[in-house]
Amino acid sequence: MTIEGLGFITKCFAEMGIPYEFMEWTQGVSFPFFVGEYSEIESLNEDGLEEGTFILTGTTTGTYLELETVKETVKNYFGYEGITAILESGSGIAVSYGTSYPIPIDEQEVRRIQINLNVKEWRC
């Protein structure tokens, strides 16, 4: 996943009003907050296509429904069909909603959710 692609995803979360940082939360703790990472799929094509999954993990001390509300916002924004854009470099990107699930953890006061987005980037 390119830096430019990560920047596009960051802008999308900002438009949705989702408190987000990449890889680790570095701001003062206020709930809920969301941290993103990604996993790439090896490309066997020569057409410049790179595919991966963007993993958004949400944490709150509120209810699971609070996290589900954010999930619905993300799901409605990206949809299963996805959104597309041409980036400043001329590369293309498509981001769509994939899957999500609650993450059980041992801390009784903390709840988590994982939201997976499908990402495709085409380099020039």
Residue ranges: model-predicted function:
Residues 1-46, 81-91:
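Small/polar-rich, solvent-exposed N-terminal microdomains that initiate assembly or binding
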Residues 48-62, 111-121:
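Oligomerization/assembly interface segments of phage tail-like spikes and tubes
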Residues 25, 39-41, 61-63, 120-124:
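Generic structural motif
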Residues 79-124:
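Acidic-leaning, charged glycine-interspersed low-complexity segments
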Residues 28, 46-48, 104-109:
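Short, ordered beta-strand-loop transition motifs
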Residues 51, 59-83:
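Extracellular/virion structural assembly segments
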